[in-house]
UniProtKB/Swiss-Prot annotation:
GO biological process assignments: adaptive immune response; B cell differentiation; chromatin organization; T cell differentiation in thymus; V(D)J recombination
Protein name (Swiss-Prot/TrEMBL): V(D)J recombination-activating protein 1
Protein EC: 3.1.-.-, 2.3.2.27
Keywords assigned: Chromatin regulator, DNA recombination, DNA-binding, Endonuclease, Hydrolase, Metal-binding, Multifunctional enzyme, Nuclease, Nucleus, Transferase, Ubl conjugation pathway
Subunit annotation: Homodimer. Component of the RAG complex composed of core components rag1 and rag2.
Keyword Acetylation: no
Cofactor stoichiometry and binding remark: Binds 1 divalent metal cation per subunit. Mg(2+) or Mn(2+).
Species name: Ginglymostoma cirratum
GTP-binding recorded as keyword: no
Broad class of the protein's primary localization: nucleus
Protein residues bound to a divalent metal cation: E69
Length: 106
């Protein structure tokens, strides 16, 4: 963790940025059959915005916490919408709803 990553290790930020752009381009061109030339929002954020997050916060810890909070928010919403009497049925419903919500094939 660095307090000022742009001053203390700018070469690492630049290296990450260049590598992430190359990786995104590789996914887009070489795996068209799999991703239809598109990538998920989470992967886009990882590849495109992590250098900005590191510059701003000094690490990706805040970004990881943001992802956890977002996931918890989704599960709370699904749980509220799909509340059932039995805990096992409730969890099953939440997981199925989450799978349907996140599946790119459906």
């Amino acid at each position: 963790r660095s307090t000022f990553p742009t001053r203390e290790c700018p070469e690492l930020l630049c290296q990450y940025s260049c590598n992430s752009q190359r990786f995104a381009e590789l996914l887009r061109t070489e795996f068209k059959h799999r991703y239809e030339g598109k990538i998920t929002n989470y992967l886009h954020k990882t590849l495109a915005h992590v250098p900005e997050i590191i510059e701003r916060d000094g690490s990706i810890g805040a970004w990881a916490s943001e992802g956890n909070e977002s996931g918890n928010k989704l599960f709370r919403r699904f749980r509220k919408m799909n509340a059932r009497q039995s805990k096992s049925y409730e969890l099953e419903g939440i997981l199925k709803h989450h799978w349907l919500y996140t599946s790119k094939y459906l």
